[in-house]
């Protein structure tokens, strides 16, 4: 990014919500001018910079993800839930980090004394993740170019040119390119942490069960809250099922919560399935972390 672009990005980052932070007219004016310059830059370049609420992100306007980010911002149901689960100084894992949007929000929430461990196996996507972390000066984001699995090694991985978030272990969706990537377990990645993992976010296109099986020691030790995607079709392509997911976590005392359209959590008393037409994700919470979800739960 040019020097001018870096200065503009710095201004936007400094005043993400100036009316709440200081309320001064000059600050509001600077913020509006800086944001306008960023938008002007986006229109003349395939790469833009977008304020996602608490952080900035590069948006590749040549891709559906980047274009959607530029047009609509990034305030998803899942991002609201993630921020609601986190506390200052937390350790959080972003498995299947893609370009790092959840990692950025997590870093902004946990602060400089927290830690974010971001895992993304696609080299092209990791390059954007690195750029996003550097854009914000988020040194707390520890980045690993690996796919999470139940054992370390290498594996065939299907990636897409548009950083769509659909990359997965082979076999994957049609239209992708197969590459070899390194795999790692969460137990290995977290073995030397000095603080417990508070929140684990997983969106690994059907490999969630593999990732959790590679995290048995960490899960039993830290009992983190888990936010993960549950797509039966994706799980089936990777040789697992929703029941496998339940059998992996339920013995550790985890209860499942569906996510409503208003980002509230509803306890699931039957099969572990997401709420229809809301979010394809579940929050899985052990009793030891029940206090973290109280503010997000619907009244009984």
Predicted regions and their residues:
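Short, conserved loop/helix-junction motifs that constitute active-site signature segments
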Residues: 106-111, 215-222, 249
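A short, conserved beta-to-alpha structural element at the edge of catalytic cores
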Residues: 121-125, 223-237
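Conserved Class I S-adenosyl-L-methionine
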Residues: 242-257
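Active-site flanking residues adjacent to catalytic metal/cofactor-binding acidic residues
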Residues: 93, 119, 200-202, 228
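Short internal loop-to-helix segment that lines adenine-nucleotide cofactor pockets
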Residues: 71-91, 138-142, 154-156, 164, ...
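S-adenosyl-L-methionine
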Residues: 1-132, 136, 140, 173, ...
